[in-house]
């Protein structure tokens, strides 16, 4: 009998983690959804079919918490086939330079960038035990400098300094890791899960076309 592939999805405030987890379940993955704080509480209350995957409370800014998650994966599965770095936070909507608080910027970077680096460092040995390991870092068009300098782009005038720069940094980090991992079997790439049709941050959902693109990455 073929062993199921094992995936970890990280989740914070954008609500997409459960969507990714369900897609993976439908494609015969064993899934661990690592969620923090309010997200964990909300997901815990849903019950029912939710628990087809393992829900694990995680502080992505804590090495101790991530080490506990790694221990769970090691003891239960002994490997990791897919890591989806989806956890993110956003603040500072519409803020001008005088309104930016450095502590708020640091908070965003802790989850959106530093946690990604930390979890890849920690989980790399587990990924190396997979036959075809893959890492998908969830990014955003707001971190795409080419798009943000295009006045025709619907988000071009958004002032989200912490979030946008954290995603731009994530894009560069992923590019550098792609070069580093190229000689190995680990595949790493960015993926933007949100279709930008209505120009609003209030509706975070995966459209059918985007969903198909995501499925193509996990097969």
Question: Language-model segments: what does each one mean?
Answer:
Residues 89, 93-108, 128, 132-182:
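Catalytic loop of short-chain dehydrogenase/reductase
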Residues 13, 17-22:
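N-terminal Rossmann NAD(P)H-binding glycine-rich loop of SDR-like oxidoreductase domains
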Residues 27-42:
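Conserved glycine-rich Rossmann-like NAD(P)H-binding loop of the short-chain dehydrogenase/reductase
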Residues 84, 119-123, 127, 173-174:
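Hydrophobic positions on the long internal alpha-helix
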Residues 168, 179, 183, 190-219:
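C-terminal helical subdomain
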Residues 48-64:
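Rossmann-fold cofactor-recognition segment
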Residues 72-85, 91-93, 101:
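A glycine-rich helix->loop->beta "capping" turn
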């Amino acid at each position: 009998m073929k062993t199921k592939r094992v995936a970890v999805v990280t989740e914070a405030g954008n609500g997409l983690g459960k969507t990714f987890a369900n897609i993976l379940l439908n494609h015969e993955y064993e899934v661990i959804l690592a969620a923090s704080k309010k997200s964990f509480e909300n997901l815990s209350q849903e019950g029912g079919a939710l628990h087809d995957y393992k829900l694990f409370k995680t502080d992505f800014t804590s090495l101790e918490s991530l080490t506990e998650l790694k221990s769970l994966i090691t003891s239960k599965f002994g490997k990791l086939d897919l890591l989806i770095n989806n956890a993110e936070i956003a603040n500072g909507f519409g803020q001008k330079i005088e309104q930016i608080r450095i502590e708020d910027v640091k908070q965003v970077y802790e989850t959106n960038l530093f946690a990604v680096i930390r979890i890849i460092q920690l989980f790399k040995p587990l990924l190396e035990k997979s036959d075809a390991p893959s890492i998908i870092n969830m990014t955003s068009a707001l971190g795409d400098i080419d798009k943000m300098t295009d006045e025709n782009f619907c988000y071009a005038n958004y002032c989200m300094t912490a979030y946008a720069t954290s995603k731009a940094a994530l894009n560069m980090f992923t590019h550098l890791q792609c070069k580093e991992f190229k000689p190995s079997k680990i595949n790493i790439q960015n993926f933007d899960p949100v279709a930008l049709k209505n120009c609003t941050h209030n509706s975070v959902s995966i459209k059918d076309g985007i969903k198909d693109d995501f499925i193509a990455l996990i097969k």
